[in-house]
Amino acid sequence: LRDARPSVWPLQKPHPPVWIAANGHGPVRRAARLGDVWFANPHAKLSTLEEQMGIYRGAVAEHGAGQPEDIVVSREVFVARTRAEALRLARPALEERFRVYATQGQDQQLPPGDRFDLPFEQLAEDRFILGSPDDCIEQIERYRRIGFNYFIMDYHWLDLDDATALESLRLFGREVAPALR
């Protein structure tokens, strides 16, 4: 790797930033109180995250801490030439992934109505970065507008073949990433 650097240096004063992941509203408040960075869950709809961003910023202010430099979100990402193609290629793997999440109860910490046992079209709405390059750019910009500025993007999932995942990643690198700089 040329010109690579770690995103977190091991020795920092007073310490490396403490990232605290949180799904529910209560844990988001706890992340504001105890951590340096809120790591927003990869499961919630954008509307839930927008509500939680307000909760987080309010709790940070209430505890007298300055607003954090970074606020982190993780999302499943799939880019194809068209939204229809992205849905067709990603759907089987995402449906299976969220079916497993539901059996593990991972949606039980989310607000009522934000659940995983929905038809795929409803599940995918505002939950994934999914579509054409232009679709994905617009979706990422929506996360930026509500305050997320550090993205962890999950491109490859069980049940998604390597070649399909790699082509999506290449398309992201060629057409989406340059537009976000």
Q: Regions from the language model: what does each represent?
A:
Residues 1-181:
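Active-site-adjacent structural elements that line small-molecule/cofactor binding pockets in enzymes
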